[in-house]
C-alpha cells in the first residue's frame, strides 16, 4: 500500500464499526480525501482529538481501494479550540466545512485554492476577527466562485444594466426591473451592497455592520442550494 503525506482540515467524521471513524478531509495537495482512522473512538487512541472537525493536521495516509487510512496525525492548528465554545462560531464553521465537503464531490483532485480559502476562514473564526455569520457567508460565496459558480451582483444577468433590484439564483444573480424573471425576489440596494462586500471579502466595510442583513443569508442559502442541489443544513442554524 502506497503511503503519502499531506496536510488537511477535518471536515466531518462518521462512525465505522465499534471503534473506527471515516474522516472526510480537505487536503492541501490531494483535494478531498476520505480515510479510515482505526481505533480513534477508543479512550486511549493514539490520535487523541487531532481528528475532530475543524482541526488542521499533518497526516501520513495509506492509499486504499474504497477509503484511504490514517497512519499518523500531528496537529498544525487547533482551530476547534477557538470555535467549539461559542454557538455562533461553531455553526458558522460547520456550515463552511459542510460546504467544502459538498463542493468537491470527486476525491483526490487537487484543490489548493479551496484549501487556502478554508484555512483562512477557519483561522479568522477561531480568532474571532469578524462576525461569524459574515465569515461563513463570505466563505460560501467565495468557495462557490472558485468552483465555477460566481454570483453576479453588480449588473443585470440579462442586459447588463446596473439598475438592479431583483435576484434570481436560477438566472445567475442580479436582475433589473425590465428583465427580472417570475421567480426573482426584490432586493434592497443595501443588501446588494452587503452581498458584494461578502463576495469580495471587504472586511473594513463588513466590520461596520453588527451582522449582515438576514436577506443576505437567505440569498446565499438559495444560491448554494440551487447549484449544489442540496441544502447546507448547518447554515439554517445561523438564523
Curated annotation (Swiss-Prot):
Gene Ontology biological process terms in this record: DNA recombination; double-strand break repair
The keyword Flavoprotein belongs to this UniProt entry's keyword annotation: no
Keyword Transmembrane: no
Source organism superkingdom: Bacteria
Pfam families from the UniProt entry: RecO_C, RecO_N
Entry GO CC: bacterial nucleoid
Keywords, in A-Z order: DNA damage, DNA recombination, DNA repair
Coiled coil feature spans: none
UniProt family annotation: Belongs to the RecO family.
Record-linked PANTHER family: DNA REPAIR PROTEIN RECO (PTHR33991:SF1)
Function: Involved in DNA repair and RecF pathway recombination.
Protein name, as recorded: DNA repair protein RecO
Species this chain originates from: Bifidobacterium animalis subsp. lactis (strain AD011)
Amino acid at each position: 500500500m502506497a503511503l503519502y503525506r499531506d496536510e488537511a482540515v477535518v471536515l466531518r467524521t462518521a462512525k465505522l464499526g465499534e471503534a473506527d471513524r471515516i474522516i472526510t478531509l480537505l487536503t492541501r495537495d490531494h483535494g478531498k480525501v476520505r480515510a479510515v482512522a482505526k481505533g480513534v473512538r477508543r479512550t486511549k487512541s493514539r490520535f487523541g482529538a487531532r481528528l475532530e472537525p475543524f482541526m488542521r493536521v499533518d497526516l501520513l495516509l495509506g492509499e486504499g481501494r474504497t477509503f484511504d487510512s490514517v497512519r499518523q496525525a500531528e496537529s498544525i492548528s487547533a482551530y476547534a479550540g477557538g470555535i467549539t465554545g461559542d454557538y455562533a462560531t461553531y455553526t458558522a464553521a460547520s456550515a463552511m466545512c459542510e460546504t467544502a465537503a459538498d463542493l468537491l464531490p470527486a476525491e483526490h483532485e487537487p484543490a489548493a485554492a479551496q484549501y487556502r480559502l478554508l484555512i483562512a476562514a477557519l483561522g479568522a473564526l477561531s480568532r474571532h476577527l469578524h462576525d461569524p455569520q459574515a465569515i461563513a457567508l463570505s466563505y460560501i460565496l467565495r468557495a462557490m466562485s472558485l468552483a465555477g459558480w460566481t454570483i453576479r451582483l453588480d449588473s443585470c444577468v440579462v442586459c447588463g444594466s446596473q439598475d438592479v433590484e431583483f435576484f434570481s439564483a436560477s438566472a445567475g444573480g442580479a436582475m433589473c426591473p425590465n428583465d427580472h424573471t417570475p421567480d426573482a425576489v426584490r432586493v434592497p440596494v443595501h443588501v446588494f451592497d452587503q452581498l458584494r462586500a461578502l463576495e469580495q471579502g471587504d472586511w473594513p466595510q463588513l466590520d461596520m455592520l453588527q451582522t449582515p442583513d438576514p436577506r443576505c443569508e437567505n440569498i446565499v442559502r438559495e444560491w448554494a442550494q440551487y447549484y449544489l442541489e442540496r441544502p447546507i443544513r448547518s447554515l439554517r442554524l445561523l438564523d
